[in-house]
């Protein structure tokens, strides 16, 4: 059975949109203006993005991710990749999508837009949100077309074991597409699921330049999969979807490998420092292991702390009262100045609630 049988039939049978006219001297086919008020190097911004520039960036990323150039397609950040995946495989009112909450809320958002079924396989905070194959098997149903792993997981910070991903790909080889969202993988001390692409045709990996690469403003990401899946995705990718300035700036940034290496190491070092400071703080009851640039903590003062930190200009992520993480905060690791300000603000909150004393449950 071909993995393409899991694609929506109406989309698989559709024709690719081919813009054409890329090499023409006079572009009289696309209704563009012949002038532009601004330019960007050699690029005339009055013209739609050049496919050649897109191919250059895809090749650059393919080399970095150690995959073949026909195994990657650019997206407008990871969100675009999630949206495309749900629309490509899920038929409204028929197919299902499995996720492992607490996780990135945009998965459920796009599944609802597609009017597909959402299968929830909850993680247990008592096990530090560790996922097992038994949990997946107990939740899976025959109409489950997509299984979504977030690794490292947002907001919990933990990795999904690569062996578990491989076993899931093998177990549901002809039944489900396995998607791994690796938005934070560069911060982890672990291999990427891209190393499994050659082995499993039902595996898709989503990557982004918004996190470790520091290019969130460019809105660039990619879908990585075996070539037949990438070719099929081209049927639903909007023409000219990636802006010329975004691609050009990304190409320039990716040439500076030393900057990325140093930045990631700095975040890891700062992460360890912040965790140590958190561990000394009596109002923080639990600190979860993290392979990301953020830290999830448990504190009974989560709501008060959110308001308190806002006075210092610090925004942190809290969670609704109905959430499993209602008494948790997700806090991003910043630069030295930001981290010190955070610790100082927490200390001032401690002074404000001085006299409180209770047992802590640290796992670090």
Swiss-Prot record:
InterPro entries, A to Z: Aminotrans_II_pyridoxalP_BS (IPR001917), Aminotransferase_I/II_large (IPR004839), HisP_aminotrans (IPR005861), PyrdxlP-dep_Trfase (IPR015424), PyrdxlP-dep_Trfase_major (IPR015421), PyrdxlP-dep_Trfase_small (IPR015422)
GO terms, biological process: L-histidine biosynthetic process
Name of this chain's protein: Histidinol-phosphate aminotransferase 1
Presence of the UniProt keyword Transferase in the record: yes
Pathway: Amino-acid biosynthesis; L-histidine biosynthesis; L-histidine from 5-phospho-alpha-D-ribose 1-diphosphate: step 7/9
Organism for this UniProt entry: Legionella pneumophila (strain Paris)
Complex formation: Homodimer.
Cofactor or coenzyme needed: pyridoxal 5'-phosphate
NCBIfam families named in the record: hisC
Entry's EC annotation: 2.6.1.9
Keywords from the named record: Amino-acid biosynthesis, Aminotransferase, Histidine biosynthesis, Pyridoxal phosphate, Transferase
Catalytic reactions of this protein: L-histidinol phosphate + 2-oxoglutarate = 3-(imidazol-4-yl)-2-oxopropyl phosphate + L-glutamate
CDD domains in alphabetical order: AAT_like (cd00609)
GO molecular function: histidinol-phosphate transaminase activity; pyridoxal phosphate binding
Protein family per UniProt: Belongs to the class-II pyridoxal-phosphate-dependent aminotransferase family. Histidinol-phosphate aminotransferase subfamily.
Superkingdom per UniProt: Bacteria
């Amino acid at each position: 059975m071909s993995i393409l049988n899991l694609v929506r039939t109406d989309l698989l049978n559709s024709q690719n949109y081919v813009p054409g006219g890329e090499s023409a001297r006079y572009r009289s086919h696309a209704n563009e203006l012949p002038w532009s008020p601004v330019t960007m190097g050699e690029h005339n911004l009055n013209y739609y993005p050049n496919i050649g520039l897109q191919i250059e960036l895809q090749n650059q990323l393919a080399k970095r991710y150690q995959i073949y150039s026909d195994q990657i397609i650019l997206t407008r950040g990871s969100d675009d990749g999630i949206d495309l995946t749900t629309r490509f495989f899920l038929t409204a009112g028929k197919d299902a999508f499995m996720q492992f909450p607490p996780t990135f809320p945009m998965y459920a958002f796009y599944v609802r837009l597609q009017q597909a079924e959402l299968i929830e396989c909850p993680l247990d905070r008592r096990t530090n949100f560790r996922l097992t194959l038994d949990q997946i098997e107990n939740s899976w149903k025959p109409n489950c077309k997509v299984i979504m792993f977030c690794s490292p997981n947002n907001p919990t910070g933990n990795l999904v074991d690569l062996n578990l991903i491989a076993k899931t790909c093998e177990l549901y080889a002809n039944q489900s597409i396995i998607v791994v969202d690796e938005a934070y993988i560069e911060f982890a001390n672990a291999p990427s699921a891209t190393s499994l692409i050659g082995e499993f045709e039902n595996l898709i990996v989503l990557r982004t330049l918004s996190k470790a690469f520091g290019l969130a403003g460019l809105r660039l990401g990619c879908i990585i999969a075996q070539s037949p899946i990438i070719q099929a995705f081209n049927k639903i990718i909007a023409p000219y979807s990636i802006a010329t300035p975004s691609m050009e700036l990304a190409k320039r940034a990716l040439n500076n490998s030393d900057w990325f290496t140093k930045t990631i190491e700095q975040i890891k070092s700062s992460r360890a420092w912040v965790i140590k400071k958190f561990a000394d703080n009596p109002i923080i009851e639990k600190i979860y292991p993290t392979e990301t640039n953020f830290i999830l903590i448990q504190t009974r003062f989560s709501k008060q702390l959110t308001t308190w930190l806002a006075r210092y200009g610090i925004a942190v992520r809290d969670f609704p009262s109905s959430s499993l993480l209602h008494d948790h905060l997700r806090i991003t690791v910043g630069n030295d100045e930001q981290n010190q300000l955070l610790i100082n603000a927490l200390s001032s909150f401690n002074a404000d609630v001085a006299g409180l004393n209770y047992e802590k449950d640290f796992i670090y």
